UniProtKB/Swiss-Prot annotation:
Keyword set, alphabetical order: DNA damage, DNA recombination, DNA repair, Metal-binding, Zinc, Zinc-finger
Pfam families: RecR_C, RecR_HhH, Toprim_4
Gene that encodes it: recR
Name of protein: Recombination protein RecR
Residues in C4-type zinc fingers: 58-75
HAMAP family linked to this entry: RecR (MF_00017)
Organism: Chloroherpeton thalassium (strain ATCC 35110 / GB-78)
PROSITE patterns reported for this sequence: TOPRIM
Similarity section: Belongs to the RecR family.
Keyword Metal-binding: yes
Length: 205
């Protein structure tokens, strides 16, 4: 079905471009917004603009942060163990670990995994930034352990293998979360208890 309104059709098309949103869902979202009060729609529009204008990436961990807060709140927290860094694929994975309230170290977000079929190599990820962090020499803040918490996919396994070979010669302990997580499952969809057990049961590579 095509709508007589160009504005309605345009918004449906834009929503349908989002991951996990089909055309029917895009239509429902558009109709919902159409019937919302103007002030609420303007608030949503402003939130979207703020997302692009005010959000950046932490210069240390590469996680999302407000532009005026860099390094991010996690990296600067005095309550965090700065000697342990958990390497994850995406910012959503940081949220998953934070929800468990069991991890007290820092993070490093790669923003992807090695995927030759998609033309994504190590240079396309935040690997150099991770290596730079390992050069810290202060005994109280220098990284002693790197936990590889990459999604258990084929691409994720390739990334883990690459990073473990890259990091071991640097004299840092390299571990990975336990394999109790099903292959092909993304960490952000794992329940807190399972993710906590995977973190606690991590093994050295």
């Amino acid at each position: 079905m095509r709508y007589t309104s160009h504005a309605v059709e345009t918004l449906i098309d834009e929503f349908a471009k989002l991951p996990g949103i089909g055309r029917k869902t895009a239509q429902r979202l558009t109709m919902f917004i159409l019937h919302e009060e103007k002030e609420k729609v303007e608030s949503l529009a402003q939130a979207l603009l703020d997302l692009k204008n005010k959000v950046s990436y932490c210069s240390l961990c590469q996680n999302v942060t407000d532009k005026e807060i860099d390094p991010c709140n996690i990296c600067t927290s005095v309550k965090r163990d700065k000697r342990v860094v958990c390497v994850v694929e995406a910012p959503n994975d940081v949220l998953a670990f934070e929800k468990t309230n069991q991890y007290n170290g820092l993070y490093h977000v790669l923003h992807g995994v090695i995927s030759p079929l998609d033309g994504v190599g190590p240079d396309d990820l935040k690997v150099k930034e991770l290596i730079h962090r390992l050069s810290e020499t202060d005994p109280e803040t220098s990284i002693k352990e790197v936990i590889l918490a990459i999604n258990p996919t084929v691409e994720g396994e390739t990334t883990v293998l690459y990073l473990s070979k890259l990091l071991k010669p640097l004299g840092v302990k390299v571990t990975r979360i336990a394999r109790g997580i099903p292959i092909g499952t993304e960490l952000e969809y794992i329940d807190d208890a399972t993710l906590t057990r995977a973190l606690e049961g991590r093994s050295e590579l």
